[in-house]
């Protein structure tokens, strides 16, 4: 069974049968309405962000599978802060995140991460926050990373 894989970037919850989906999937005889509906359902939580989407199509049976990636960590942080962009100077602070928010972002990124450990992904999110000029719980993210290492956040991390 020949398969075709199509990779596109879609704004969360706003896929349409037009470009980039239409040209990429046109001619395969698929129900575009069904594909668009499923993509929009799976990406609705990423409204306002571009999300990587992969559609795997069995060209004989016309069955398809949709896989949705996660936006970059920096985009998730900006969405939480309702900010347009990070600071060009990490010493200039653009906002503050609660540790619960950092953990939620880490949970979103866990599936696509190189490590199965939530604690490590939390530290990666903290590193991104640092480079963007974002504090966590009113502190420098490096300080919060040390707290994570010492076990101070284990209760929140399920550890």
Curated annotation (Swiss-Prot):
Function summary: Forms part of the ribosomal stalk which helps the ribosome interact with GTP-bound translation factors.
GO molecular function, one term: structural constituent of ribosome
SMART domains in alphabetical order: RL11 (SM00649)
Region feature (Disordered): 137-159
Alphabetical list of SUPFAM superfamilies matching this protein: Ribosomal L11/L12e N-terminal domain, Ribosomal protein L11, C-terminal domain
Protein family (similarity comment): Belongs to the universal ribosomal protein uL11 family.
Gene Ontology biological-process annotations: translation
Name of this chain's protein: Large ribosomal subunit protein uL11
Biased composition annotated in UniProt, kind: Basic and acidic residues: 137-149
Organism: Korarchaeum cryptofilum (strain OPF8)
InterPro entries: Ribosomal_uL11, Ribosomal_uL11_C, Ribosomal_uL11_C_sf, Ribosomal_uL11_CS, Ribosomal_uL11_N, Ribosomal_uL11_N_sf
Record Pfam families: Ribosomal_L11, Ribosomal_L11_N
Tree of life domain: Archaea
Keywords: Ribonucleoprotein, Ribosomal protein, RNA-binding, rRNA-binding
GO-annotated cellular components: large ribosomal subunit
Assembly, per entry: Part of the ribosomal stalk of the 50S ribosomal subunit. Interacts with L10 and the large rRNA to form the base of the stalk. L10 forms an elongated spine to which L12 dimers bind in a sequential fashion forming a multimeric L10(L12)X complex.
UniProt xrefs under HAMAP family: Ribosomal_uL11
